[in-house]
UniProtKB/Swiss-Prot annotation:
Residues at the active site: 99 (acyl-thioester intermediate), 392 (proton acceptor), 422 (proton acceptor)
Pathway: Lipid metabolism; fatty acid beta-oxidation
Biological process according to GO: fatty acid beta-oxidation
UniProt xrefs under SUPFAM superfamilies: Thiolase-like
Subunit structure: Heterotetramer of two alpha chains (FadJ) and two beta chains (FadI).
InterPro entries, A to Z: 3-ketoacyl-CoA_Thiolase, Ac-CoA_C-AcTrfase_FadI, Thiolase, Thiolase-like, Thiolase_C, Thiolase_CS, Thiolase_N
Name of the protein described by the UniProt record: 3-ketoacyl-CoA thiolase
UniProt KW keywords: Acyltransferase, Cytoplasm, Fatty acid metabolism, Lipid degradation, Lipid metabolism, Transferase
Family: Belongs to the thiolase-like superfamily. Thiolase family.
Taxonomic path: Bacteria, Pseudomonadati, Pseudomonadota, Gammaproteobacteria, Vibrionales
Pfam families found in the cross-reference section: Thiolase_C, Thiolase_N
Length: 436
């Protein structure tokens, strides 16, 4: 049994989530086309502080993440500090844990508060699928380096003559695991086949996600956590996620062809998250400091856990490994939760994890536990829709989930909630939140 996690300061103060905000999430090459992740990160942090009328000089630490990193700005956190009016001496560093990046950022800030190093910090993440670090071939890179050292024109011409047309082709960022060459979509297909997840079940979950997200927006439940963004060159604005299918029918999902296994596959563009641009941030502080500043927290971080498993098979099963650890560390069980929010990278991955939560066999063989984690009550599950509908700017999703979950938990009168996500590299994250 995992030990209880005491996420309080020496004085017994909890880690408060005081505020959370995100940009609208936009499909690749749409509203944020040409806008770097860094700009979106600065945009959302600045807006969050302005909405609170919060002095940026009070921020003592920023931990931010970016999965698709740009070489010209490798430390996005520090650039956000420099671009938002914070004190020049504010500590800032960047993290990456693939799709669980902003959960890691939140955990790091929480640990700094617990240790007494800081009282106030910002965690979050931003990613752009529209502004990508397009590279060059290894041969061209080596030749360019040699050219910079060549002293004569004849040597330069000789080096250039060794290049072929293929060597000059741009190299886009990899979409597959470095160690295996397997993509996320291929893993989702494998999980669907291995765990008996049908095409109909996947399409039904995607339809549910979009329907619930559309209703949440229509009912005004999301408006308060999403800013209006005016991306350069400031000719247009966006104030709402543009991936949500507001008027789709379940039948329309069945029309799409499989994306990763054309002949026998069940994973399609409609039951997968799209490439997305966006940023999200949360403001964390010591509970007592929030009271001193007259700020009412959205809620508190009760526990968290991270997991790692093999990447050859079931690579996206991280929630099923991280969740029981987080529950144990919080001293609660699945049945104690008011809400469960699981990142929907793919409908297949989500449903496979839901299935494993209720599997005693999985718990015994993979978790070393005698009983299953627990059957998920779908009335508590992704009640406002999930990533299939909102989209998934990799590093921003965790912060979106934390803010969205705590706000909904408050509307329901408080209680405990689970946020959990799979991530590339066989990683997983789970966080238990509480609100009053």
């Amino acid at each position: 049994m995992t030990r209880l996690q005491n996420l309080t300061t020496r004085q017994g103060e909890r880690i408060a989530v005081v505020s959370g905000l995100r940009t609208p999430f936009a499909r690749q090459a749409t509203a944020f086309n040409g806008v770097p992740a860094l700009d979106m990160g600065k945009m959302v942090v600045n807006e969050m502080l302005q909405e609170l009328d919060f002095d940026p000089k009070l921020i003592e630490q920023v931990v931010f993440g970016q999965v698709v990193q740009m070489p010209e700005a490798p430390n996005i956190a520090r650039e956000i500090v420099l671009g938002t009016g914070m004190h020049i001496g504010t500590d800032a560093y960047s993290v990456t844990r693939a799709c669980a990046t902003s959960f890691q950022a939140a955990a790091n800030v929480a640990e700094s508060i617990i240790s007494g190093t800081i009282d106030i910090g910002i965690a979050g993440g931003a990613d752009s699928s529209s502004v990508l670090p397009i590279g060059v071939s290894k041969k061209l890179a080596a030749t360019l380096l040699a050219l910079s050292k060549a002293r004569t024109m004849s040597k330069r011409l000789k080096l250039l003559s060794t290049l072929s047309v293929k060597d000059l082709m741009p190299v886009p960022p990899a979409v597959a695991e470095y160690s295996t060459g397997i993509s996320m979509g291929q893993t989702a297909e494998q999980m669907a086949k291995s765990h008996g997840i049908t095409r109909q079940e996947q399409d039904a979950l995607a339809y549910r996600s979009h329907t619930l997200a559309a209703k949440a927006w229509k009912d005004g439940l999301i408006r308060g956590e999403v800013m209006t963004a005016f991306p350069e060159p400031y000719g247009q604005w966006i104030d709402k996620d543009n991936n949500i299918r507001e008027d789709s029918t379940l039948e329309s999902y069945a029309k799409l062809r499989p994306a990763f296994d054309r002949k026998f596959g069940t994973v399609t563009a409609a039951n997968s998250t799209p490439l997305t641009d966006g940023a999200a941030a949360i403001l964390l502080m010591r509970e007592g400091r929030a009271k001193e500043l007259g700020l009412k927290p959205l809620g508190y971080i009760r526990s968290y856990a991270f997991s790692a498993i093999g990447v050859e098979q079931d690579m996206l099963m991280g929630p099923s490994y991280a969740t029981p650890m987080a529950l144990d560390r919080a001293g609660i069980s699945l049945s104690d939760l008011t809400l469960i929010d699981m990142h929907e990278a793919f409908a297949a991955q989500t449903l496979a994890n839901v299935k494993m939560f209720g599997s005693k066999k999985f718990a015994q063989e993979n978790l070393g536990r005698s009983q299953a984690i627990g059957e998920i009550d779908m009335d508590k599950f992704n009640v406002l829709g999930g990533s299939l509908a909102y989209g998934h700017p990799f590093a921003a999703t965790g912060a979106r989930m934390i803010t969205q979950t705590l706000r909904e938990l408050q509307r329901r009168g408080g209680g405990f909630a689970l946020n959990t996500a799979c991530a590339a590299g066989g990683l997983g994250a789970a966080m238990i939140l509480e609100a009053e």
